[in-house]
Each structure stands twice: as structure tokens, then as C-alpha cells.
Amino acid sequence: SHPLWFPNTLAPSWLNGEYYGDRGFDPAGLAADPDTFERMRIAEVYHGRLAMLAVVGALVPDYLGKGIWYEAAQNAGIGLKEVAIFTAAYGVFEVARGVKENSDPTTIYPGFDPLNLTTDYTKEAEIKNGRLALTALLGFEVQRHVVGGSPLANLAEHLQQPLQRNIADSIMHQWPVAMFASSGHKDGLWFPNAEPPALLTGEYPADRGFDPLNLAADPDVYARMRVAEVFHGRLAMLCTVGCIVPELLGKGAWFEAGDSVDGLKLGFITMAIAAPTEYWRGQGGFNWQKGELDRSYPGFDPLNLTTDYTRAAEVKNGRLALTAVAGLTAQYLATGESPLANLSAHLANPIGANITTNLAMFASSGAKEERELWFPNIVPPRYLTGEAYGDKGFDPAGLAADPVTFERMQVAEVFHCRLSMLALVGCLVPELLGNGAWFQIWDKVDFNRFAVVALQVVAPLEYWRGNGGFLWNDEETVDQSYPGFDPLNLTTEYTKEAEIKNGRLAMNGMFGLEVQSHVTGKSPINNLID
């Protein structure tokens, strides 16, 4: 009955709207324990108050011309003396707070309120403003590292050039895979180190050298395709808004619209609008054979707002929207639910509800509705009963016949899977960011120093494991690979199965990368482009 953080979501049973600011958001189940929930609520109020003060302290001096917030420490000359004063000031309060036992936690409201101004409304407002302030501080920090300017300076630039100076410009302009970015900058190819066809010179907006089928070789065809892309992109952007916004407003899912609309009437109205335009286009309205090929830009622009930047941005946003519409359709056919319903299900259970949940043996899905075997119609060994996670009956060498050996192998597989998943990310992400191929890393790293550091990290863990850390020969549990490190208690039967499957994929992936480097001498991304 209380407002929720996202439409159509289901709040956990322990979040019933009793407390201020409760919107039913707890995907990790952190508030299930009442004592922990109590501490977290108090901590949120404290951090929210500090954040609100910090936001004011960051913006007001900048507004008054006293400098940027992150320069304050450099200019204030803060040293050991100042730190000691700060510690003495807040240390007394922290000690007093820590020694009070069985104190009433509601004393966080109002805190200091000699005039008795606190009401239910102000308590709720304080939580909301505190959350905004916490988000704002995170934004200030990110903004500082991305653009290197103050919040007010960035705001002034944005107000002067809202289309060119925005978050998309800052993020997408730096990302090497820029084809589908919403920014209008004309830099980068569709994939790092790709070789564009000679006919794609970068002359036209959002040309990223992508034409594997050589469709743009004919100039007339290329002109038609460019105009068609703009048209379809515009329709897709309108379509995406038309799918998402009504559902946000509680008007139902996009695929239910036909149930409440007269199809014949809609068809006649659509034809009455589209037919004259299509007739004009079919009768040479774009003068494709007369050299006037670019009437898609600006299209309708009575205020003359179109620039090279907006043209490129329109194409990129259109491509995003075309992809989104295809995704909405595929999502509906696969799940039968609306995009927001799928999103809320994913956010509530990101591991159990995602694109991979319906795939097969080596998929990341952890579902075990019925046992699947590694090959159709085979007979698994009698000792592989499907009880263990990821057991698909594959053991041609009979290695798992001994229960103790099988136990060791299970734990070892989990370890190697986790390492492989980390390794695969470490191989691909740096190359996507333009930092070179994975096998070139030793050109930049001192191997001896790296080995010493790695040994210092790994050796204690291996010593503990080798000296009975997993109690393989004792009567106690041998399954400390699950959950391993799981302070938030997120591990479930599903995640254990999914981890094994993803790990097997990753081990195959790493083996493939190694073979690929020896056979072709190129990185995985370059091989993919080729």
C-alpha cells in the first residue's frame, strides 16, 4: 500500500512502509535482520545529514568565488594539528554514542530540535534530501575525475550548450566503441583497430566504418540507405518513448495497446497522415537522381537548430532506439512481460532473472528444473547422480569414482572457474579500453616484482588450504567453496549452479585465447574484427 521505488515491484516482507523513506528497495536483503536494519536506518540519517552539509559546503564557496571544493584542502593547509582538532571535536560524540546501551534509537529524530519543529513530513523529507545529497556528492566526485571542473562551471557550460555539453558527451566521447553512443562527436570506428572500407571516409554523420556486406559501395544506394536510416531512427525513438512512458504512467504494457484501440480507426488515421508523405517521397520527393540527396537533414527545422553535432547525435540515438525496439520485441516473445516488469524482476533478483536464464548446459543459467546431460541420450556413470552443482554426467576417465577425489575436484573446479572468470575480464576489458592486447602486458610489467607480490598474496591462502583449511579429511563440512566469501548471504542453489557454468565457459575462453595468440599472433578483439 505504500509507494515503491519502481512501478510494479514487490517489496520484501520486512519492508512494510513503517519507517520514513521506506520504498521497498533492498535487493541484497540487508534489512532482513531487525538489528542490522536499525543500525542502517540510523547510519543513513547521519550520512544524509553530513552529505547535505557537504553539498552546501561544496557549492556555496564556489558560488561566492572562493574556489572549487576539491581545492579547499590544498588551500587550507590542513595538517596534523587540524586533524587532531577535528578528531577531538567529533570523537567525544562518537564515544558517547558508542557507550550508550539500550538507548532509544528514535533519538535520531529530531536530534537537536529545541523548537520542536520536527514532524512526520520533515522526517520523510530529511531522508529523501539526504539520499539526493549522497548521490550529488558521488556525482561531484565523478565529475571532478571525468571533466576536471567544478560543478558550477560544468553547469554553466551545459546551459550554454545543452546538446554538446552533457553527461553523454563526457562518457561516450571517451569510450572507444562509439558507434551506438548518443554523443554527436565524430571520433572512433565502430570497433577498436577496425579497418573501414575505402568507400566509408567519415564524411557523413555517424559513419563509423561499419559495412561488412559492402552495401554502401553504390553511391545511390548509400544515399538511400542513409536517408532510410534517419527515418527509421526517428520512428524508433518515438516508438521507444511510446513503449516506456505509458507504462511508467501506469497505462499498461506496450503490447497491450491493441486491446484498447480500434484497429480500423487507427489504420485509417495512420494512412491519412502517412499516405500523402509516402506519395510525395515515391514521386521523387528526395530528388535522389538529381544530386539533392540529403533532405533528411535538417528535415523539419524552422528554427535552424541543426548542426553537424546534432546530425551525428540523431543517427546514434536512432541506432540505439532501433536496437531497443528489437530488444523490447524479443523480450516480450521470450518472457511475455513488459520491459519495466522485466527490469524490476531483474533488479529484485539480478542473478536469477537475466538474459541468460533460459540457455542450456554451458549457459550462465543456474536453473535445474530437470537434469540435463552433456550429450543427448547418454548414460551417466552411476556415481554422478546430479546431486553436485553443474553435474552433467561427464566423466569419461572415471576420475570422480572416488568420493574424496571427487570432493577435491569439485572445490578445485570452483577455484579455477573463479580465476578464469577474472582472467577473461582482465584480458578483454583493457583491450576494449585501448590499453593493448593481454599477451603484451609483460612488456609493461616487471615480472619479478609481480611474482613476488602475487606470492605474498597467494602463499598464505595456499598454506591454509594445504594444511586442512577445507577439512577434507575431517567429519566437518567440506563445502567451504560455497559460499566462500559471502558476507551479504547472496548465495543460493541457483547461483552455485550458475557459477560453475560461467566458470566452465571462462576456462574454455581462456584456453581459446591462448591458442588464438599462438596461431594468429593477434589479440581476441583484432581476430573478432578480422
UniProtKB/Swiss-Prot annotation:
Official protein name in the record: Light-harvesting complex I LH38 proteins
Domain of life from the UniProt record: Eukaryota
InterPro entries: Chloro_AB-bd_pln, Chloroa_b-bind
Cellular compartments per GO CC: chloroplast; photosystem I
Keyword terms: Chloroplast, Photosynthesis, Photosystem I, Plastid
GO terms for biological process, alphabetical: photosynthesis, light harvesting
Location(s), subcellular: Plastid, Chloroplast
Gene3D superfamilies with a match to the protein in the record: Chlorophyll a/b binding protein domain
Chief localization: plastid
Keyword Chloroplast set for record: yes
Other comments on record: The LH38 protein is synthesized as a 100 kDa polyprotein and is entirely imported into the chloroplast where it is subsequently cleaved into 5 mature 20 kDa LH38 proteins.
PANTHER family, A to Z: CHLOROPHYLL A/B BINDING PROTEIN
